């Protein structure tokens, strides 16, 4: 249910980029000052139809640039570009959380031409998502986060505002005990005031889950095992919702159509509830993903590639994606567009995209070590395999593990 947000677990592939830097400088000067040439574009297979129209419009406005649109797999962007950068796409769709790895490996071309536009036109969290070490590398076009889907026949708008009332009035089907709990409940630590890789998500030694707030989070997770309003659900979450076994579940915009099929006009969607870890209600947070386009470091037509990437993430293009696919725009102006704010799921995502409700998923290379370590701690805590007396030691080990850069 993670919709391509999660990155692959492959580690950083070191690539010599000195020659590429020289080529970049040469291609950005002289005759290359005019955006022209042939550019290969990779987009996910399921979106090819939409992008054919967008690319056709781009070529009309930019007759000196010819785009070769090809199907790719955005979730595997780093791996696929690294295989053969010179043969890969000049512009490619990617989840933002691979940017740190790709930048460090010399695989991704910095946004040297449209950095100012990206910063001015998109919300701060989207800009943060495509920025690595104070340099903008990619071009955002959508934000996505998990939201709370619920049955409006079971809950009133007030009853979904706290985890306590949510699980007292009905039952939520969610995953504490299997793979994937890391993505849903890892942000609980940030909800309670902790940091994952520091305040900006770029410090390998900046995770501080091994404190009192972290212990409170583990105790809360353990308590959910005996909460009658919590039903352990993973792949069966949607069927449980449709059958009435559960009344709510947490997922992203990728589940919207399936939830509508399951609940019909009873479907509601809202931002996450608050949680009491023992010191009053705190806003439950989620990871925020930023869908983006990026330019291959080895492109032979950098100006043309950047021109295309910028067009694909423009206000006009983002509105097309919302209408045709359902992507929630990162563009500031569109986030106040009435057509978007009146959409139930989009409205919930816009609220979740605020810093009070989400944390931009870190793009640091070490994040690949976080996922398995976090899953193990959440799963075992929920199942009772970790006793309260061992919480501190487990969190110490978790923090140690998350600072490691995984090996190939």
Residue ranges and their predicted role:
Residues 323-376, 380, 404-408:
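Long, aromatic- and glycine/proline-rich binding clefts that accommodate carbohydrate-like moieties
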Residues 57-122, 137-138, 153-154, 247-248, ...:
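Extracytoplasmic "Venus flytrap"/periplasmic binding protein-like
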Residues 4, 10-11, 18-98, 277, ...:
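Conserved N-terminal structural module of periplasmic/extracytoplasmic solute-binding proteins
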Residues 44, 224-301:
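Extracytoplasmic/periplasmic substrate-binding proteins
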Residues 82-83, 87-90, 118-150, 174-175, ...:
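A structural signal for short loop-to-beta-strand junctions that line the ligand-binding cleft
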Residues 203-232:
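Glycine-centered hinge/linker elements that transmit conformational signals in sensory
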